[in-house]
Amino acid sequence: MSHVSICLLSEAGADPGALSILADRWGLVSDDQAVMALVLTAERLELRKRDEPKLGGIYVDFVSGTQAHRRKFGGGRGEAVAKAVGIKKGYLPRVVDATAGLGRDAFVLAALGCQVQMLERNPVVAALLDDGLRRGYLDAEIGPWLRERLTLLHASSLTALVAIEPRPEVVYLDPMYPHRQKSALVKKEMRVFQSLVGADNDADGLLAPARALATKRVVVKRPDYAEPLAGVAAQAAVVTKSHRFDIYPSSVTPPR
């Protein structure tokens, strides 16, 4: 496993031994000079940009905040991502989210009843996801179904997509995309995130293995101004104000 250098910090109230366990598990090497810091607080694990402290910490929270609000008051099956993966009454596809990020869309699909396996190759992001899942699993309200429906695999999608069993009906891709220079200051979260992981320059290579793995379809989330992934025109799309969800059929002929 290749090691990633990041500043590792522990705040008052955090378990003092947890940081070294975290570093060992995810292959992290502490670098006091690094701009990016992974901070263990008494409540959770956070990612911070040390040269821009006003941006605050980035963390995964499935229990409260915007995720809880989206689960309770969002569009439910009417949400664009739900329509794109094909959720219908009596049909809840199994989904592999091959670019999990902070797990937002994966959580929405799991909350609607889908079984979702998240793939995340960046060890820092995987550590944040794992921390959010751990807290979510312990929650009295969402824990019982979250444990059943939402899981994490720390692996590169370029290799993992070939080997996943059983095959999911849907593979979901939401690769990082370079933001327009002219756009307003990118949301703080995106700025911190892109400082860590950059753009997914190899994302075009995901479409073919995703279509070979999915038994029904691949869904690719793109900014409205972005070219289709790998330059391949989509069969259909669900369009929102600022994004579109491009839909591609599976490339595997179903058995007769």
Swiss-Prot record:
What catalytic activity does the UniProt entry give for this protein?
guanosine(1516) in 16S rRNA + S-adenosyl-L-methionine = N(2)-methylguanosine(1516) in 16S rRNA + S-adenosyl-L-homocysteine + H(+)
Keywords of this entry: Cytoplasm, Methyltransferase, rRNA processing, S-adenosyl-L-methionine, Transferase
Q: Name one GO biological process term.
A: rRNA base methylation
Q: Which domain of life is it from?
A: Bacteria
Query: A GO CC term?
Result: cytoplasm
SUPFAM superfamilies, alphabetized:
S-adenosyl-L-methionine-dependent methyltransferases
In Gene Ontology terms, what is one molecular function of this protein? 16S rRNA (guanine(1516)-N(2))-methyltransferase activity
Please report which protein family the annotation says this sequence is part of: Belongs to the methyltransferase superfamily. RsmJ family.
| Protein function | Specifically methylates the guanosine in position 1516 of 16S rRNA.
What's the protein name? Ribosomal RNA small subunit methyltransferase J
Species for this entry: Yersinia pestis
